[in-house]
Amino acid sequence: KLLTDILAGVLEMHSKSAPKYGSEKSGAPTNFYITLSPDPIKITNAELEDVEVVISPDHRSFIHTNPLRGLAAGGTFILQSSATPEEVWAELPPQARKTIREKKINFLVIDAFAVAKKHAPTPELATRMMGIAFIGAVAGHVQQVSAGASAKAILEKMRKQIAKKFGSKGAAVVEGNMEVIREGIEATHKVDYTAAAFTKIDAKPAAIALRNVSLSASMCQTSGSSGCGGMFDREYF
């Protein structure tokens, strides 16, 4: 929701957003759809089938779903990972690599977890901070958003929206969020799968992954005061 509000303000567009939850209560995969348009958006709560940008905060998402499904040719895929671009590419299923190459997808990785952990004053705010790091990744590296604008111009627009959202909480809160956005931009790396190193990875036998949704569910605690405190488990990310 925060990403929707910030991007709509930066781009000066109309917006709609809607979550889609699984039937399970804890640890279930969740999709969140965002639509931005210069014209009023008539549809509501729509499950989008064709999209231009996909953000996956779960680096194991390929184990239990296909985050590339519906991503348009030339679109952008942003994946949470603490690994190097080469390591990330090596862990992808062969079919995912094939899809990314054929559709010429702009593939980016960011360790939003590390950025969030560094700045979050409490575990309860860590999830929000992780989302703000992704805002930096989108604003700084997605062509539909940056539209060739300079980093300075983008950050100035972002600051206005952050001040609008959090200004009542004080200048320190605004600056703290801006620092996360700046680091989110800097922590985002392009996966240059056209390079020779990635071609060599493709030639190696693919690793066999165990398809078990519990791998993603394991990042949420089943007890305790914070239902998603386990999300910030370095062993998971």
Regions found by a protein language model. Give the residues of each.
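Active-site cofactor/cluster-binding pocket
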Residues: 1-233
